[in-house]
Amino acid sequence: LKIKKLLNKYKSLIQESFIEGKEIQTAVIGNKAIGSVEIIPKRKFYDFKAKYLSSAKTIHKIPPEISETLHLKIKKIAFKAHKVLKCKGVTRSDFRVTKQGLIYILETNTQPGMTKLSLVPEIAMKHGMNFKKLVNWMINDAGINR
């Protein structure tokens, strides 16, 4: 019934299976996966409100509460995605990690958010790169013909 309503409203739909597990997002800056954040929304889904309203009380854990071995695997996958997709500069890859330790890459964002509420600047800050340094790095990197 819901699908029929949606098909009446939209021309096409994509249906994906829900993967139960932790939401981990990993930043790649240049030639290094610098770190990750675990997203713990208080809402049922990590939607617009959970991302951008302080009243949503979404928790960001840096580093994520996973084993160091699992975190290293995730960072390697994020970096590999960055390279395979021929990305330059900054990317953010989003993952789901099941209780069994299975890693699912959901997407790689080639233009991740760069606001004060965005995850890449937050991850960079926790690894010693404040917002000004991050933006300056991006400007300098944009001038490199690789």
Positions of PLM-derived features:
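Phosphate-binding site of ATP-dependent enzymes
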Residues: L1-K76, K99-Y104
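Conserved metal-phosphate-binding beta-hairpin within the catalytic cores
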Residues: S17, T26-V28, H82-M114, A124
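Active-site "cap" helix and flanking loop/linker of ATP-utilizing ligase/carboxylase catalytic domains
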Residues: E38-T91, E122-R146
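Beta-alpha-beta core module
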Residues: L117-V120
